[in-house]
Swiss-Prot record:
Sites where the protein binds NAD(+): 12-17, 36, 98, 121-123
Lineage: Bacteria, Pseudomonadati, Pseudomonadota, Alphaproteobacteria, Rickettsiales
Protein name: Malate dehydrogenase
Positions that bind substrate: 85, 91, 123, 154
Leading EC class: oxidoreductase
Pfam families: Ldh_1_C, Ldh_1_N
Length: 314
């Protein structure tokens, strides 16, 4: 007997939503509901992707819709709805507009798919996860924000590029909010198992250059927004969300930095912020508390304060 395919709903059919739908189809992770308020956009993108299925050898169903009823009984939901950044805008500038959208999305998740695992991508990320959480009444382990995976990927790529080595050999991660106060942890970065701090001591790269990479990581999203001049990044954000989705659907129990709910971990309560988590079949199965030096702790708590302030503005 053939196992029933998972149902994955994508709320928002913009650049990230469309890219997600195609990536899910290529990996055959499940059937897709592509939902958007714009009539014709999700239907057109769904048809375009499914017309590529004979070439891609993908046997999943992709349905475009404008009706929230169609997300009923989803196994997983990825939210990308809302307006994107434009040059000169910060992620925080999106707050009021996107908060209203997230409230509506959360209420419909509560109504139609209260048992789904939910990944929020919409910016300003940490605040938007909180809005969806409150309006959906989801358990804290079943909702996360996609930020740390993306920020960590940028950090890893910039290091690999500067060192002229394979990205596969670079391990690094970023804590804190998805914004200017994020904390790329140099002390936990390594190259093929060799701590980055030792690579610096060897003279392969200078600490000054690493600090430049840290700053470039913090401004990674802005760099792309400025280059595109209309819209924001979507390939890397989509890939990041897929890694989280796949870890949940396949119970991979990968350690991934996500905006997760803290209930005392790191001395923080009742806040979603980027920390290392284990994602498996039960959603966020564990929050890992890593030790930080005084400087890193100071930066992390500065990030916590920035996220709290943003959440209070909403």
């Amino acid at each position: 007997m053939t196992a029933q395919r998972k149902k994955i709903s994508l709320i928002g059919a913009g650049n990230i939503g469309g890219t997600l739908a195609h990536m899910i189809a290529l990996r055959e992770l499940g059937d897709v509901i592509l939902l958007d308020v714009s009539d014709g956009i999700p239907q057109g993108k769904a048809l375009d992707i499914t017309e590529s299925s004979p070439i891609d050898r993908s046997n999943v169903n992709i349905t475009g819709t404008n009706r929230y009823e169609d997300i009923k009984n989803s196994d997983a939901i990825i939210i990308t709805a809302g307006i994107a950044r434009k040059p000169g805008m910060s992620r925080d500038d999106l707050l009021q507009t996107n908060a209203a959208v997230m409230k509506e999305v959360g209420e419909n998740i509560k109504k139609h798919s209260p048992n789904a695992f939910v990944i929020v991508v919409t910016n300003p990320l940490d605040a938007m996860v909180s809005v969806v959480y409150k309006s959906s009444s989801l358990p804290t382990n079943m909702i996360v924000g996609m930020a740390g995976v993306l920020d960590s990927a940028r950090f890893r790529y910039f290091l690999a590029s500067e060192l002229n080595i394979s990205v596969e050999d670079v391990s690094a991660f970023v804590l804190g909010g998805h914004g200017d106060t994020m904390v790329p942890l140099i002390n936990y970065a390594s190259i093929a198992g060799i701590p980055l701090t030792q690579i610096i001591e060897m003279g392969v790269i200078t600490r000054g250059k690493v600090d430049e990479i840290v700053e470039r990581t913090r401004n990674g999203g802005k760099e792309i927004v400025d280059l595109l001049k209309s819209g924001s990044a979507y390939y890397a954000p989509a890939s990041s969300a897929i890694s989280m989705l796949e870890s949940y659907l396949k119970d991979k129990r990968r350690i991934l930095p996500c905006a997760a709910y803290l209930n005392g971990e790191y001395g923080v309560k009742d806040l979603f912020i980027g920390v290392p988590t284990i994602i498996g079949k039960n959603g966020v199965e564990k929050v890992l508390e890593v030790k930080m030096n005084d400087s890193e702790q100071e930066m992390f708590y500065k990030s916590v304060s920035a996220v709290k302030e943003l959440c209070q503005l909403n």
